[in-house]
Amino acid sequence: FIVEGGSAGGSAKQARDRVFQAILPLRGKILNSWEVDESNLLSSQEISNISQAIGVYPGAEDLSNLRYHKICILADADSDGLHIATLICALFLKHFKKLVEEGHIYVSMPPLYRIDVGKEVYYALDEAEKESTVKKLDKKKPGIKKTVTRFKGLGEMSPGQLRETTMLQDSRRLVRLTIDNASYTEELMDKLMAKKRYADRKEWLEEKGNLAEI
């Protein structure tokens, strides 16, 4: 698990299964590596740490030294966390593409909300799922108080909550990073990440920005 933030990394280390799970905390925002030459990539300490931890160097086609079958990106569920997760996805898509093609890269989906109903606990990924869950619970358990808590970040979650929502195989949610259309993926990521595409990005946001729920 590549985990955003030192405090969350500490909780994640307590939450993991030590037999087959490992934690790499990222301290600070990772470099936008989309336009960085691979020869200069490892000068970034965070990227160098990722490369050493997984056993694969940027641009490698040979994965025989890969240390983990699943590499999971674990960041906060808010917009800042999604930004960091996007930067890490861009790193793998651009410089560790073979890992993506072979299905080794995943994005963890931590909850943004916790819903307490009596002694029962439910988790929701986002606002829409929270509203849907509360609505179902109102029908299923009418008259019982529902308490909704919004997590400010992974560091606010206890090791037990992190284990249940992001690490236990039976209850966690993972999305595998895939490339279905290479040219489309390259163009989209270039538009999102390349500094030289500022004008295109601005135009895209003006046209499509109203389609996003903030």
Explain the meaning of each model-derived region.
Residues 1-214:
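Conserved phosphate-chemistry cores used by DNA topoisomerases
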